[in-house]
Amino acid sequence: MKSQETRSSWKRRGSRYKARRRAVDILFEAEMRDIDPVAIVEDRVVLSRLNGTDVNQVPSYTKEIVSGAAMELDRLDELIAAHLAEDWSLERIMTVDRAILRVSVWELIFNPDVPLATAIIEGVELASEYSTDVSPAYVHALLDSIAKNIDEYRAGSVTPVENSEAEAAGYPVEESIEEDSQ
């Protein structure tokens, strides 16, 4: 179980971290309820304007992440899956870890204003806060592997060039999605 310090550390974080955290919450909820994450955002925006509700306003950066991740979901999932070990599938990853990876990979690929190191560190922090003790390490390895080939991925490729570091560390990393299709 996470310590009280770890659970409340997000309160000391900046607005971007809180927006990422809210995006993870929304993507997680959308997958668990099998609904469109953009619809959840729209509902939360309406609810936050009503008197007598405890629903907080949705930060604009959360809206940007959620709408971007929803629009690019297939590509994000392909890219994440391309970096998993052969015996792992995207569905095998915990739902919360998928949400964290989708937010972090979206930032890596589609928001060049966020430094790569920041997107990686924030993803690892979210995994530390939300997930198991082993999740931060494999989230870090996967995001680092993607960051090493960021120019190819930003140009539209989903085939990783290399991922030996994460694989050598024993984390679930796959050589290439092209190998799976042959």
UniProtKB/Swiss-Prot annotation:
Residues 159-182 are annotated as: Disordered. Gene3D superfamilies: NusB-like (1.10.940.10). Keywords: RNA-binding, Transcription, Transcription antitermination, Transcription regulation. Involved in transcription antitermination. Required for transcription of ribosomal RNA (rRNA) genes. Binds specifically to the boxA antiterminator sequence of the ribosomal RNA (rrn) operons. One of its GO terms (molecular function) is RNA binding. HAMAP family: NusB. The gene is nusB. PANTHER family: ANTITERMINATION NUSB DOMAIN-CONTAINING PROTEIN, N UTILIZATION SUBSTANCE PROTEIN B-RELATED. It comes from Corynebacterium diphtheriae (strain ATCC 700971 / NCTC 13129 / Biotype gravis). GO terms for cellular component: cytosol. Transmembrane segments: none annotated. This is Transcription antitermination protein NusB. GO terms for biological process: DNA-templated transcription termination; transcription antitermination. The keyword Nuclease does not apply. InterPro entries: NusB-like_sf (IPR035926), NusB_fam (IPR011605), NusB_RsmB_TIM44 (IPR006027). Belongs to the NusB family.
